[in-house]
């Protein structure tokens, strides 16, 4: 059954604004109302009460928004038709204050936001080893890797953050906990071995300056008994060399060739004796230092053994009371 003509809402009122508004503004208001969502249906009684209050209140000039005219007494009837409901409770699409908000196509999306992520810090956060340095040459300083963060699509209606979604937070927390547990296990492992050559014993050793002078090569660095290391060949016992049998040369055969050869032999013998004496002096000074260091280390070993026996006794009493570990 068709409704009476008085109950039908004219098409311009559904899409248009108040009376006297330009035709373009009415279409824009209708499009805005459709995009912003239809309002909930109002009860006829509430609409009538609002209409009575509007008639009773004095006309006030309001600042119109884009496409809206100033509400006055001349358009009260049009507002009643638009805002008021039909007998069946079907209200018209009345423009509300929410229409003054910026529209979707007027919003600016942050397409230029770029985040900088440190790759090594990201890997360490998740318990992964950092990127290995390139082979050969010193490793360069870690530079931040420019990684563009994912930005939302132009057509998306929500203001999604460019970072990862909250659903990834439990996975990141689990990875962080695993990395921390792995770091704790690594710290409780046996420490790496120490090079014994780099260990220095705290002791006072002041060798005689004359012995150091005899143990040093003239024009070279002073001999240091604390750091000097002898090779295995140098520490091998040297065999006793027998002297060569002397050969008597008559005076008439001692010419220039004989004297030059004898001079060279004497110089070689002198260099050999000096080198042997230098090595003997170095070994003696080094041996004096090692003897004193050995005595000090023996005292430390005795103290460590006493402490070890004490801890073993404590451990045995604990195992006897609470069982084996």
Swiss-Prot record:
One of its GO terms (cellular component) is nucleus. The keyword Cytoplasm does not apply. The modification Phosphoserine is found at residue 86. Residues 283-297 are annotated as: Leucine-zipper. Pfam families: bZIP_2. Residues 129-153 have a biased composition (Pro residues). Its main location: nucleus. Residues 221-236 have a biased composition (Basic and acidic residues). Residues 255-318 form the bZIP domain. Residues 29-38, 71-80, 88-100, 166-176 have a biased composition (Low complexity). CDD domains: bZIP_HLF. Residues 17-28 have a biased composition (Gly residues). GO terms for molecular function: DNA-binding transcription factor activity, RNA polymerase II-specific; RNA polymerase II cis-regulatory region sequence-specific DNA binding. Residues 1-100, 124-198, 212-255 are annotated as: Disordered. Residues 257-279 are annotated as: Basic motif. Keywords: Activator, Biological rhythms, DNA-binding, Nucleus, Phosphoprotein, Transcription, Transcription regulation. The keyword Ligase does not apply. SMART domains: BRLZ. It comes from the Eukaryota. It is found in: Nucleus. One of its GO terms (biological process) is rhythmic process. This transcriptional activator recognizes and binds to the sequence 5'-RTTAYGTAAY-3' found in the promoter of genes such as albumin, CYP2A4 and CYP2A5. It is not essential for circadian rhythm generation, but modulates important clock output genes. May be a direct target for regulation by the circadian pacemaker component clock. May affect circadian period and sleep regulation. Belongs to the bZIP family. PAR subfamily. Binds DNA as a homodimer or a heterodimer. Can form a heterodimer with TEF. This is D site-binding protein. It comes from Bos taurus.
